[in-house]
Amino acid sequence: MSKLKTRKSAAKRFKATATGKFTRRRAFHNHLLDHKSSKLKRHLKTKAVVDERDADNVKLMIPYA
């Protein structure tokens, strides 16, 4: 059987954890940050875990993660 291809766009956006879950960046932290509070911006810097309903699709896109 041939090797499975990795979707590079997904590989750049998601990272697998040691327990098999995936982490992702949060949205809304690129620009237009002036009106957002420091607390919100600090929260948006942190990584989030991909929801279990979406994890199966991410796993298919990154088969060797």
Curated annotation (Swiss-Prot):
Gene3D superfamilies documented for this protein: 4.10.410.60
Keyword field contains Disulfide bond: no
A single cellular component GO annotation: cytosolic large ribosomal subunit
GO term, biological process aspect, one: translation
Record keywords: Ribonucleoprotein, Ribosomal protein
Gene name per UniProt: rpmI
Natural source organism: Prochlorococcus marinus subsp. pastoris (strain CCMP1986 / NIES-2087 / MED4)
A molecular function (GO) term: structural constituent of ribosome
Similarity section: Belongs to the bacterial ribosomal protein bL35 family.
A Pfam family assignment: Ribosomal_L35p
Designated name of the protein: Large ribosomal subunit protein bL35
Disulphide connectivity of cysteines: none
InterPro entries assigned: Ribosomal_bL35, Ribosomal_bL35-like, Ribosomal_bL35_CS, Ribosomal_bL35_sf
Listed NCBIfam families: rpmI_bact
Domain of life: Bacteria
